[in-house]
Curated annotation (Swiss-Prot):
Important for recycling the chief excitatory neurotransmitter, glutamate, during neurotransmission. This is Glutamate dehydrogenase 2, mitochondrial. The keyword Mitochondrion applies. Expressed in retina, testis and, at a lower level, brain. The modification ADP-ribosylcysteine is found at C172. It comes from the Eukaryota. Belongs to the Glu/Leu/Phe/Val dehydrogenases family. It comes from Homo sapiens. The gene is GLUD2. The active site is at K183. GO terms for molecular function: ADP binding; glutamate dehydrogenase (NAD+) activity; glutamate dehydrogenase (NADP+) activity; glutamate dehydrogenase [NAD(P)+] activity; GTP binding; L-leucine binding. GO terms for biological process: glutamate biosynthetic process; glutamate catabolic process; glutamate metabolic process. Its EC number is 1.4.1.3. GO terms for cellular component: mitochondrial matrix; mitochondrion.
Length: 558
């Protein structure tokens, strides 16, 4: 379990306003019990007045078990919200019965429901045979289908897929996407296989999942993850639709992240990175948080570092660069590069496509130290889990850590960052852009029509007639003195009123989702006096939503 400590928040980086707020309001708030709702209505007061941080008493090693790590974060959120869940139960039960019920449901939520372990043979192009290992974990079926990516990596393990599946459950709940969490992994290094061999592996893995009932539009819907993309998702969709889903009109909804020609959706490739950008945007534009960090709101003149130049890292870098932030370092598994004057994401992307690595990029120098310890405003770990640990957390110089990867921060590192007043924007919120747009793709496949197709021309004509009506009204009033009064929209407004494309709808819906979820997290952080502990606030929100589904549905066969 976690031990909670609370103290007045007097941040070393905070400006005079934040320090003043802490001095004026810490006395009142320190008198409250831990995790109790705050009375302050202004964001700055609750933020500056008090903070909770925690330490995992039973698991202090620098490389903790990944699934235990996620369970520990869950326990932290559950202990904060338990009293509220008991209070909100509208039953005739006694207080003790209500608490037993709440604790029982929390115990149901926490473990992984199903883990499928597979092994199957493939014949390689050279005639040799190889046995491939793979896993699919379904953490929760409180909502169906289950949802989660498929990754190809030699580091895949049962522990990893269980942890990632549980994160998917909480991630979907945080952004109000009605899926349960799942994850799959195939234990291979895709660089060691030809395209033909990868297709064999992908199609056979799909069939093995189908035989066990672990794939289907209403059951379990995979998506791209590490070392997989549109190509692999297309193979999965084709395999399912050509076999077990042959008579299912919704067969192509069995997987998301597909090419457009196979039922994919515009904006899915960049969705996770774009979600990372919107997530950072919502907090970096919040003056109350920035005052505690000693930063000015907005991206302008901010520096950032990206660890991992894959899909998430690239698109995060692109959007932050576009809005005025400067990327000064990029790290990959084979090395890092650095340029204090900034690195252009398009130029680096082109170089990597041509050379297969970021090393040797002519407009940056090799960086020999740890990319995580570069002096910057924003650090984006977008690689793998457990990168920020007790060992390196004291040397991290960033003021904001934006978790583009899943589980990049261990509990001990998380505690250190809270002690140092470093704002960690947690993974279960920040990288939820991918599953959000996957949800839109899934709905598109079930509806069998692209977004905007039914309304595109109607909206354009309606906007045209609205402007024409305004013009005619002005001419009736003033036209006799000066003739016609043309209404000429700006180029930007013209694009907007011409009708929203599918990409426009997806981008707008993603931005709205990330903004709404950020506001919910901020509200919870203030309500429970959590200060900069956004991770606990996000878990509290997720637990409340999942709990509500279980509680109102009832528990079968108990």
């Amino acid at each position: 379990m976690y031990r909670y400590l609370a103290k007045a928040l007097l941040p070393s980086r905070a400006g005079p306003a934040a320090l003043g707020s802490a001095a004026n309001h810490s006395a009142a708030l320190l008198g409250r019990g831990r995790g109790q709702p705050a009375a302050a209505s202004q964001p700055g007061l609750a933020l500056a007045a008090r903070r909770h941080y925690s330490e995992l008493v039973a698991d202090r090693e620098d490389d903790p078990n990944f699934f235990k790590m996620v369970e520990g974060f869950f326990d932290r959120g559950a202990s904060i919200v338990e009293d509220k869940l008991v209070k909100d139960l509208r039953t005739q039960e006694s207080e003790e019965q209500k608490r037993n019920r709440v604790r029982g449901i929390l115990r149901i939520i926490k473990p992984c429901n199903h883990v499928l372990s597979l092994s199957f043979p493939i014949r390689r192009d050279d005639g040799s045979w190889e046995v491939i290992e793979g896993y699919r974990a379904q953490h929760s079926q409180h909502r169906t289908p289950c949802k989660g990516g498929i990754r190809y990596s030699t580091d895949v393990s049962v522990d990893e897929v269980k942890a990632l599946a549980s994160l998917m459950t909480y991630k979907c709940a945080v952004v109000d996407v009605p899926f349960g969490g799942a994850k799959a992994g195939v234990k291979i290094n895709p660089k060691n296989y030809t395209e033909n061999e990868l297709e064999k592996i992908t199609r056979r893995f799909t069939m093995e999942l189908a035989k066990k009932g672990f794939i289907g539009p209403g059951v379990d819907v995979p998506a791209p993850d590490m070392n997989t993309g549109e190509r692999e998702m297309s193979w999965i969709a084709d395999t399912y639709a050509s076999t077990i889903g042959h008579y299912d009109i919704n067969a192509h909804a069995c997987v998301t992240g597909k090419p457009i020609s196979q039922g994919g959706i515009h904006g899915r490739i960049s969705a996770t990175g774009r979600g990372v950008f919107h997530g950072i945007e919502n907090f970096i534009n919040e003056a109350s948080y920035m005052s505690i960090l000693g930063m000015t709101p907005g991206f302008r003149d901010k520096t950032f570092v990206v660890q991992g130049f894959g899909n998430v890292g690239l698109h995060s870098m692109r959007y932050l660069h576009r809005f005025g932030a400067k990327c000064i370092a990029v790290g990959e598994s084979d090395g890092s590069i650095w340029n204090p004057d900034g690195i252009d994401p398009k130029e680096l992307e082109d170089f990597k496509l041509q050379h297969g690595s970021i090393l040797g990029f002519p407009k940056a120098k090799p960086y020999e130290g740890s990319i995580l310890e570069v002096d910057c405003d924003i650090l984006i770990p977008a690689a793998t889990e457990k990168q920020l640990t007790k060992s390196n957390a004291p040397r991290v110089k960033a003021k904001i850590i934006a978790e583009g990867a899943n589980g990049p921060t261990t509990p001990e590192a998380d505690k250190i960052f809270l002690e140092r007043n470093i704002l960690v924007i947690p993974d279960l919120y920040l990288n939820a852009g991918g599953v959000t747009v996957s949800y839109f793709e899934w709905l598109k496949n079930l509806n069998h029509v692209s977004y905007g197709r039914l309304t595109f021309k109607y909206e354009r004509d309606s906007n045209y007639h609205l402007l024409l009506s305004v013009q005619e009204s002005l001419e009736r009033k003033f036209g006799k003195h000066g003739g016609t009064i043309p209404i000429v929209p700006t180029a930007e407004f013209q694009d907007s009123i011409s009708g929203a494309s599918e990409k426009d709808i997806v981008h707008s819906a993603l931005a709205y989702t990330m903004e709404r979820s950020a506001r919910q997290i901020m509200h919870t952080a203030m309500k429970y006096n959590l200060g900069l502990d956004l991770r606990t606030a996000a878990y509290v929100n997720a637990i409340e939503k999942v709990f509500k589904v279980y509680s109102e549905a009832g528990v079968t066969f108990t």
